[in-house]
Amino acid sequence: MAAAEPAVLALPNSGAGGAGAPSGTVPVLFCFSVFARPSSVPHGAGYELLIQKFLSLYGDQIDMHRKFVVQLFAEEWGQYVDLPKGFAVSERCKVRLVPLQIQLTTLGNLTPSSTVFFCCDMQERFRPAIKYFGDIISVGQRLLQGARILGIPVIVTEQYPKGLGSTVQEIDLTGVKLVLPKTKFSMVLPEVEAALAEIPGVRSVVLFGVETHVCIQQTALELVGRGVEVHIVADATSSRSMMDRMFALERLARTGIIVTTSEAVLLQLVADKDHPKFKEIQNLIKASAPESGLLSKV
């Protein structure tokens, strides 16, 4: 990992601190990607010690080939700002480690061990309103079958299920890691963050469901803002309005989010015909995905 300024990257001897800070130390909340972990550092700790602490807390999830910058949450502005030059920790604070730039040489790579599938709000009450809903259900089910074959964790949300119903019956939720109700549009809930924290080395999220311009868009932007690479499956996401869907996908692609297809995702995950699961994935995609009107309006 290259930092924004020189830093000692050796791991500290001690582990993460508990809820209370020891004498002579200051409590600090360390945020990385979708995670946030409380710890403590010595009073007066600077940039290098903060980097060491990030590595001790998140070492197995940080891509050492990428460049990162440390930012401090500024109450005055209500947002994160780059760590001021010569900064020293003197009081309780919140810091985060964010990618400084995207490595184009690795952009878009998917591996089963570093990928999670997000299935967003594929619920019964949306059936009459969402364009080509039957098609995206079919493709979504194919993706979940692929996830089971490859051992990829799946997280499913349902938007206000009391009023909008549960996930449609055609979507088989056997073996999914989590099914969560929500009212927030984004899928990035505290329970989702906790679930991701239990999965080592998460780099990428494959995202699909409804609606493209609301829950899908807000989930994708929040994940990217936390350093997660997002792949949106175009043939498994839709909206009530094709215009909303089209402009959402265009906007998301401009932010570096990858707009892809279900077959591209599944074949990228096996990567080689000699992969032990290739035959099962091949059988899954033998029947082409539905040629719906979605594909002419990406």
Swiss-Prot record:
Pfam family, one: Isochorismatase
Entry GO terms, CC: cytoplasm; peroxisome
InterPro entries reported in the protein's UniProt record: Isochorismatase-like_dom, Isochorismatase-like_sf, Isochorismatase_domain
Source species, domain of life: Eukaryota
Family: Belongs to the isochorismatase family.
Protein name (Swiss-Prot/TrEMBL): Isochorismatase domain-containing protein 1
Residues found modified as N6-succinyllysine: 279
Keywords: Phosphoprotein
CDD domains: YcaC_related
Keyword Phosphoprotein: yes
Modified residues (Phosphotyrosine): 160
